[in-house]
Design a protein with these regions (language model features):
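Short loop/turn segments that flank or connect secondary-structure elements
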Residues: 1-189
Length: 189
């Protein structure tokens, strides 16, 4: 049954209005790689770019430094491409626990309970929220470094790299991170 009554309905509604209809904003490379691996899809099949500010640490340099973009989960007419709309007009995240960490954290409230928030998830309690925040911070810091390293490489490239080249680098760099090995460019340098 899709209907949820009481506080859980309010929680799901606020989550959908804030994130699902607009698409997740604070997605890291680790999130994109985890989704890509699980769905057996290259990241460019479910991501899109948006203009990035000059000082944005997630701004990926493309086209011989003529463009800076953010790479994010794509939006469809109804919001995030993974947002599944029900016949009643409500929605659910089609990724469940695979969703980006920032999506799983929002809108968790310190002191919340772990009762189910509907199919496929639950509200995070304080300990789970703290663990998710630590994971997100580590992923975010790695994402910032990954983008900075890519931007340095892109400036030196003989042919202008595109967003798919960046995402290939992302897949390699995340694999290196998980294996505890050096960055891809440090191995071949």
């Amino acid at each position: 049954m899709d209907s949820i009554a009481g506080p859980e309905a309010q929680w799901q509604t606020s989550r959908a209005k804030a994130l699902c209809y607009r698409g997740p904003r604070y997605v890291t490379g680790a999130d994109l790689v985890r989704i890509a691996r699980t769905l057996a899809l290259e990241p460019w099949h479910f991501t899109q770019t948006a203009p990035a500010a000059a000082n944005d640490p997630t701004g990926v340099v493309l086209d011989n430094a003529r463009r800076r973009v953010n790479v994010r989960v794509a939006n469809a007419a109804h919001g995030c491409v993974f947002h599944i709309r029900t016949l009643e007009g409500t929605g659910r995240c089609g990724l469940g626990e695979l969703a980006p960490v920032s999506c799983r954290m929002f809108p968790s409230v310190p002191g919340g309970n772990t009762e189910p928030a509907g199919e496929g998830g639950h509200r995070l309690d304080e300990e789970e929220l703290a663990a998710a925040e630590r994971q997100w911070i580590a992923d975010r810091d790695h994402w910032f470094e990954l983008v900075a390293r890519w931007n340095t490489l892109a400036e030196k490239a003989e042919t202008p790299p595109d967003v798919q080249d960046f995402q290939r680098y992302l897949l390699e760099a995340q694999a290196a991170r998980e294996a505890g090995t050096p960055w891809p460019e440090d191995v071949v340098a």
